[in-house]
Design a protein with these regions (language model features):
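Kelch-like beta-propeller repeat domains
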Residues: 1-358
């Protein structure tokens, strides 16, 4: 569908394509279909009202290099365009943070040959990549992939975990504070004294608590343990919370129909996870508890309104909605599902869907 058009060229979309995938009381409704969306282990962030997709893999072939293109999807107009051609840094299994609603900060990832810890930024106002330099006190990890990078403020990110096979999995995972300065285009890592269990392909949730905020991580290893990877007082976090009253009310109604559990999903990795008010919504991923048919399509809701918080699982009977290496984004009171590999774990899905809870 013209996926090789030059940067800046708007592309026609198939709108409303596909069928709705339903769980018992929820549904992923396809709203757009385009070859540009067909990727996995990419990033997806909202910048200036558009969803920016960067990098990822087009197939499950181990020798295929990652993508390096930047695609912008307008959720209001349902239009897409390539805003950055496939000529810059290539990345998959990376993570991102948006600074000042302008810079898309890409942290670490797999470049096709190595795991890297370098930081590069896409300037949405200039429409170009910026190569940021290491600061004088930089103490970087050896390499990062399948890690998480969580924004704490406009100048501070928290990086947790990195790749490691189950047989060679390290006992502990280091936690890094990553300082960033868009004015000087510099960054520097500092390793924290605290650690978590070794994780890769996990999720990180920045959640409010009585004292301020805590960063909770789950998944990415063969257990159901949740861990706290950082705590901050109320005045230390400078991140805008996204207003989503409709979706918050829908999630409240959804969990009200089920019994929760204190146990997080066991042995799940490469799922998506997005915080929505007092909830976190996780979907899909790959289970480590089975040898075959490992890609999942369950929806999980983490409810922090009670103490201790509870997990709620909502299964889906539609195998076609199994996803791994996908992303979810919250924008304008809607949760978007973008890309990922399908049930076979190697064929990318070219759809963008929205979560519907009747």
């Amino acid at each position: 569908m013209g996926a090789n058009r030059l940067a800046g060229g708007a592309l026609p979309l198939q709108v409303g394509a596909g069928t709705m995938a339903t769980g018992s009381s929820w549904a992923w409704k396809p709203i757009a279909r385009n070859a540009l969306f067909a990727r996995a282990y990419h990033s997806c962030d909202v910048v200036q009202g558009k969803l920016l997709l960067f990098g990822g893999l087009k197939s499950g072939e181990p020798k295929e290099p990652p993508l390096g293109d930047m695609v912008a999807f307008d959720p209001t107009l349902l239009t897409a365009e390539t805003v950055g051609p496939n000529g810059g840094d290539r990345r998959s299994h990376h993570d991102t943070a948006v600074l000042a609603n302008r810079w898309l900060c890409v942290v670490g990832g797999w470049d096709g040959a190595h795991r890297v810890s370098a930081v590069c930024c896409w300037d949405t106002e200039q429409g170009q990549w910026e190569r940021w330099a290491e600061g004088p006190s930089n103490d970087p990890p050896v390499g990062l992939s399948s890690h998480t990078c969580t924004k704490v403020s406009e100048h501070e990110l928290r990086v947790v975990g990195r790749e490691g096979g189950l047989r060679t999995q390290r006992r502990f995972a280091s936690i890094y504070t990553l300082r960033v300065n868009p004015a000087t285009k510099t960054y520097w890592y500092k390793e924290e004294e605290s650690r978590t269990a070794s994780r890769a392909g996990h999720s990180a949730m920045l959640l409010r608590d009585a004292g301020g905020y805590q960063l909770v991580v789950f998944g990415g290893r063969d257990s159901s343990d949740c861990e706290v990877a950082g705590r901050w007082g109320k005045g230390k976090i400078h991140v805008e919370s996204i207003h989503a009253p409709k979706m918050t009310e829908q999630l409240s109604r959804l969990v009200g129909s089920e019994n929760g559990s204190r146990q997080a999903p066991k042995g799940l990795r490469h799922q998506s996870c997005t915080v929505v008010g007092p909830f976190a919504v996780a979907f899909g991923g790959e289970t480590l508890t089975k040898g075959r048919d490992t890609v999942c399509n369950d929806l999980y809701v983490y409810d922090t309104r009670c103490s201790p918080p509870s997990w709620f699982r909502f299964p889906c009977s539609d195998r076609g909605q199994k996803r791994v290496g996908h992303r979810t984004c919250l924008w304008n009171d809607k949760l978007y599902l973008v890309g990922g590999f399908g049930p076979d774990g190697k064929t990318p899905c070219p759809e963008i869907c929205v979560l519907e809870i009747p």
